[in-house]
Each structure stands twice: as C-alpha cells, then as structure tokens.
From Swiss-Prot:
Part of the 30S ribosomal subunit. It comes from the Bacteria. Belongs to the universal ribosomal protein uS10 family. The keyword Ribosomal protein applies. The keyword Ribonucleoprotein applies. GO terms for molecular function: structural constituent of ribosome; tRNA binding. PANTHER family: 30S RIBOSOMAL PROTEIN S10 FAMILY MEMBER (PTHR11700). Keywords: Ribonucleoprotein, Ribosomal protein. Involved in the binding of tRNA to the ribosomes. InterPro entries: Ribosomal_uS10, Ribosomal_uS10_CS, Ribosomal_uS10_dom, Ribosomal_uS10_dom_sf. SUPFAM superfamilies: Ribosomal protein S10. This is Small ribosomal subunit protein uS10. One of its GO terms (cellular component) is ribosome.
C-alpha cells in the first residue's frame, strides 16, 4: 500500500466523545509506526429549530432549539496491514459516526 492514505471522518453531537474517539484512533495508528495527520477539527454544523410555544395563538412566543454536529478528520499516510487490523479491533462509542475512505 505505498503512497496511499486512509481518510477517517468522525461526526458526533458530543465534542468530548468525538475527541476521545479521535485520540484512540491516533494512538492505535501510531502504535503501528505510520504517519498520522490530525485530528483536524472541521467546522461545526449548527441546526436551529424554531417552534411555537402555544398551539393556537401567541405567535410572538416562540422557542428555539439547536443541535450541533462536531466533525474531525484524520489522515493515516502509507498504512500497513497492522494498521488496518488495529483499526478493526478498536472499540469506539455508539454516539460517534465513522466514515472511512481508502
């Protein structure tokens, strides 16, 4: 796998959870003696939802909720077979979405 890289994109609602997961991935990759770039923080997406507090009237009384999606990017440069095995064996929390591109 010469001159290749693995790009790992993490997404989660909890920034502490995503940072812990990124740290686990980086440590597992560094144990196999490969070069790791990241974790690179990507822009946080903020989704704001506005709803009426009352059902039938009082349109001026509204409530807003927001949901933030935190993202991180990790590049593993020139991975070997040990790196792939180490990444497969990682036990990461359920609240983190992982997208891997070879």
């Amino acid at each position: 796998m010469a001159n290749q890289k693995i790009r790992i994109r993490l997404r989660a609602y909890d920034h502490e959870l995503i940072d812990q997961s990124a740290q686990k991935i980086v440590e597992a990759a560094k144990r196999t003696d490969v070069k790791v770039s990241g974790p690179i923080p990507l822009p946080t997406e903020k989704e704001v939802i506005t709803i009426l507090r009352a059902v039938h009237k009082y349109k001026d009384s509204r409530e807003q909720f927001e949901q933030r999606t935190h993202k991180r990017l990790i590049d593993i440069i020139n991975p070997n077979a040990k790196t792939l095995e180490a990444l497969k064996k990682l036990n990461l929390p359920a609240g983190v979405d992982i997208e891997i591109k070879l």
